[in-house]
């Protein structure tokens, strides 16, 4: 179970669409290609709408009382473990992971003033998962904030990074260290992000919502069913047909 938010260009302001995706397993098609089993995606400009859709799908499709749930997200607003607890409801076990891509980016962004320490901190946090060593490295960085590095901005970035790592320490623990009896099937959400944001377009809210709905149905193999339903007629407002064609081509 994964989720993320993606910002796209809007005609009046930036728009953010929210996506949750779920699958039962991942199988290897080749050395470089994997396929999700029973994958479903739920996307909307409204996080609450997407959240309610995936909650309803899980409740109506699965009995999770004896199921291990593995979730993965960037930890932003609406994507913390408690949010996924709400989606899942009652289950046998829920293991939540902080997305490694976003963790690395956070460390590099916050330590942009001291690149030489980025790799050391990433190693201590992700590969060794050593809380004491992590604190030692952070203390070392702080002690080296002298001369031109001794700025309020650098001190604030370091303080915020330390707080970020402490708050999310449990979620940072690696898949291998948790000794789970399943294969790693997370980390797909970022790589599967729709190319709507790469179309060079400025989307209206109605146009973006309509195209996201169509693309989600394509991903879920439900387009024909959805377009023939009464629900589609009141929700679909594509606008520019060229926008639709470009976005669809990018996702086929």
Language-model regions: role of each:
Residues 1, 96-99:
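Hydrophobic/aromatic beta-strand patches that form the interior of the parallel beta-sheet core
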Residues 1-70, 77, 82:
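RNase H-like nuclease fold core
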Residues 56-93, 100-252:
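Acidic/histidine-rich catalytic cores and adjacent linkers
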């Amino acid at each position: 179970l994964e989720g993320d938010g993606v910002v796209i260009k809007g005609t009046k302001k930036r728009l953010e669409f929210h996506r949750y995706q779920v699958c039962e397993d991942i199988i290897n098609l080749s050395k470089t290609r994997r396929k999700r089993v029973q994958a479903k995606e739920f996307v909307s400009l409204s996080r609450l709408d997407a959240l309610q859709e995936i909650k309803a799908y899980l409740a109506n499709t699965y009995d999770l009382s004896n199921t291990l749930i593995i979730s993965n997200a960037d930890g932003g607003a609406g994507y913390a473990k408690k949010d996924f607890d709400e989606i899942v409801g009652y289950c046998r076990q829920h293991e939540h992971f902080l997305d490694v891509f976003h963790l690395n980016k956070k460390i590099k962004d916050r330590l942009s003033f001291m690149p030489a320490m980025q790799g050391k901190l990433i190693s201590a946090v992700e590969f060794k998962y050593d809380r004491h060593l992590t604190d030692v490295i952070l203390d070392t960085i702080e002690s080296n904030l002298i001369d031109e590095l001794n700025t309020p901005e650098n001190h604030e970035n370091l303080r915020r990074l330390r707080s970020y790592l402490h708050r999310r320490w449990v979620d940072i623990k690696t898949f291998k260290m948790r000794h789970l009896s399943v294969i790693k099937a997370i980390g797909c959400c970022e790589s599967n992000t729709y190319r709507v944001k790469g179309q060079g377009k400025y989307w209206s809210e109605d146009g973006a919502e309509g195209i996201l709905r169509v693309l989600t149905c394509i991903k879920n193999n439900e387009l024909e069913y959805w377009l023939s339903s009464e629900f589609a007629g009141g929700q679909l407002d594509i606008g520019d047909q060229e926008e639709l064609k470009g976005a669809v081509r990018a996702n086929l």
